[in-house]
């Protein structure tokens, strides 16, 4: 067993295990991240620019026609006070439009923290970096849906 004569040699756990977040940027000055929501998976590249957002080769206003989905997409940029400062290119597949918007939002949030690690506390507090793990509950046999039973008749 090791000699524990001096407790001063032991480093506090908080200092030793605190992760240091460094800037992750490729040779083209882009940060890459993946975002997921329901069955949708988004691959997102973020770079400094004029605020263009392109999803699957189309402008985000045409891809996500509903204003609610456009707002969901822009939430991390607004929360970090960086709206209009980054160009975002994303490819997203799987799921429906709502899940895809959530996946792109998750990917944009992660890519922003890689590009600018100082934004991490703001985005973390807003809940943008947490993967929303809620998925559709499976249908069970003997039931009409996941939880709904068939109509019951006493007589």
From Swiss-Prot:
Gene label: rpsI
Entry GO terms, CC: cytosolic small ribosomal subunit
PANTHER family reported for this sequence: RIBOSOMAL PROTEIN S9 (PTHR21569), SMALL RIBOSOMAL SUBUNIT PROTEIN US9M (PTHR21569:SF1)
Disulfide partners: none
Name this protein carries in UniProt: Small ribosomal subunit protein uS9
Keywords: Ribonucleoprotein, Ribosomal protein
Gene3D superfamilies registered for this protein in UniProt: 3.30.230.10
Family: Belongs to the universal ribosomal protein uS9 family.
């Amino acid at each position: 067993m090791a000699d524990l004569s001096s407790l001063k040699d032991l480093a506090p756990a908080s200092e030793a295990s605190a992760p240091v977040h460094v800037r992750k940027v490729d040779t083209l000055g882009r940060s890459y991240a993946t975002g997921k929501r329901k069955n949708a998976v988004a691959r997102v590249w973020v770079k400094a620019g004029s605020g263009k957002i392109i999803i699957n080769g189309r402008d985000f206003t045409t891809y996500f026609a509903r204003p609610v989905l456009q707002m969901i997409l822009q939430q991390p940029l607004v929360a970090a006070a960086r709206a209009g400062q980054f160009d975002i290119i994303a490819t997203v597949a799987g799921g429906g439009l709502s899940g895809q918007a959530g996946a792109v939002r998750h990917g944009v949030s992660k890519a922003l923290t890689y590009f600018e690690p100082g934004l991490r506390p703001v985005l973390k507090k807003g809940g943008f970096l947490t993967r929303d793990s809620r998925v559709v509950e499976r249908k069970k046999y003997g039931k009409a849906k996941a939880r709904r039973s068939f109509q019951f008749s006493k007589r």
